[in-house]
């Protein structure tokens, strides 16, 4: 096997052209909105964080009523917490004792790995599996571009989603805010629809029809809210190509749910194994990649009654991030256990399977950390997020513990993919790291690929590729 591409192949900063350094000056980027969410959070105290279930609770609720409210607002674990609360122990000791017995059984089962994934879905656990770096504390938790016209949605740590166009500013951005929308993990604009966006959060799915009259300071209601079974939080979601089906995953559920919003129907894709953590629908609509909180991941065939192939990554890890090539023939992913970039190849509606070698998961790049300048600045290590540009020429990688962004050149052929390290991007300061990245869709075939970077400082940067 040929030697893997690695980060040591990149030239040091001192030899890079100006274009590959911290900024590139492209005239059309000057018309993009200037966004710094940290400044907006400080300047707009009205954009406070809302938490579901905190509004107007009667002080004289009985025990059973409190437990029922906890179940509908927070699911099983909130119910168990309420059953074991000091107030319940005082008013209904038998219920509290029953709660203790249930908690002891679940603790024993988890310790014996009888129910290894049965545990409370805390914000810390959600943060472990989302693609956003330092999700708990990051000013920006997610970015999503509209597929059909210039419109960028930015989800903040304050549970507010701000919608920016080319004419938007911090004071004129459309705002989506609701008590039913907390701990946002993902967002997606609906394909073939100009104004509908769905937001995945602790409470489930919030569907919004974006209206320019929605401004900061007003609390509004989503047009629809879909609750996940058992009131679990959404941790990943993806629309199919034509916007008729929405796939969702939760780290508390083994099933992938396929929603049909127009009919209100949902179909669970059930398999034994650990809960789902990450979904990626292929651009050609043929395949749905589904990672789990453990080594197992699956690739579902969307045209053969949801048949699936089961795969396993390296021991001790799970798939942290993945992305499809624009043509849909290649899938790249990285495990949390090792800094190696892997690929799977898809041709003619089936996984290559004529021989054992063809069906292997192939490593194509070594992402181990290395020093890049005289100051021994490190780049690389365990990957946080992958993003592939719409033209298929560049792959961008961010990392969990180092602050530079690695850029690889990619060369896609029908049956082969080649990759080589190109250069690095860095923030305005050495301490600034990328929280989330995504590419703007191509609105015209000859558009440049524009990478959108949410930095830990709260600012949004746009970087245009050739």
From Swiss-Prot:
Gene3D superfamilies reported for this sequence: YVTN repeat-like/Quinoprotein amine dehydrogenase
Function in brief: Involved in mitotic spindle assembly.
GO terms, biological process: microtubule bundle formation; mitotic spindle assembly; mRNA transport; nucleocytoplasmic transport; positive regulation of protein localization to spindle pole body; protein transport
Record's keyword terms, sorted: Cytoplasm, Cytoskeleton, mRNA transport, Nuclear pore complex, Nucleus, Protein transport, Repeat, Translocation, Transport, WD repeat
PANTHER family the record matches: ALADIN (PTHR14494:SF0), ALADIN/ADRACALIN/AAAS (PTHR14494)
Domain of life: Eukaryota
Record's keyword annotation contains Nucleus: yes
Protein name (Swiss-Prot/TrEMBL): Aladin
Any matching Pfam family: Beta-prop_Aladin
Organism: Drosophila melanogaster (Fruit fly)
Subcellular localization(s) per the UniProt record: Nucleus, Nuclear pore complex; Cytoplasm, Cytoskeleton, Spindle
Entry keyword annotation includes Lyase: no
Positions annotated as WD repeat: 135-174, 179-218, 229-269, 271-310, 378-418
UniProt-listed InterPro entries: Aladin (IPR045139), WD40/YVTN_repeat-like_dom_sf (IPR015943), WD40_rpt (IPR001680)
GO CC terms, sorted: cytoplasm; endomembrane system; mitotic spindle; nuclear pore; spindle pole
Phylogenetic classification of the source organism: Eukaryota, Metazoa, Ecdysozoa, Arthropoda, Hexapoda
